[in-house]
């Protein structure tokens, strides 16, 4: 029996799965499931957004750190036409928005330049987890 007739080992299957997922993530123009990405790809919307209530996806793609883009897929909240993010401590993207509030958000294939503004510290705002900071996303032109 030759080596080429042996079934692949479990570790080989896992390596192929991880590699395949990484290749998919690299080609999607942003984050992929739980894997962070780089610069978001899509149509950049230059008109300011006054009302974010059109956002009805489960997740938003958030691009941080304009000098070396880092993007993640995350939950969001729309309240009274405003878009809010509530990062947990220890998230890399949370550190990045503290350093530079300029971000871009993507819903579908549309990208909106924005900046984030801290509006609440843990426990200050009703309707958000008590251990989270709360940021409002404000539209900006690039």
Predicted segments, located by residue:
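Short, structured beta-strand-loop surface elements
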Residues: 46-49, 68-70, 90-142
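Juxtamembrane/interfacial segments flanking transmembrane helices
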Residues: 31-34
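Post-signal peptide N-terminal segment of mature Sec-exported envelope proteins
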Residues: 37-58
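Residues embedded in well-ordered secondary-structure elements
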Residues: 17, 51, 63-65
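Bacterial N-terminal signal peptides
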Residues: 14-25
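Short beta-strand segments
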Residues: 55-89, 115-117
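Bacterial N-terminal signal peptides that target proteins for export
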Residues: 3-16
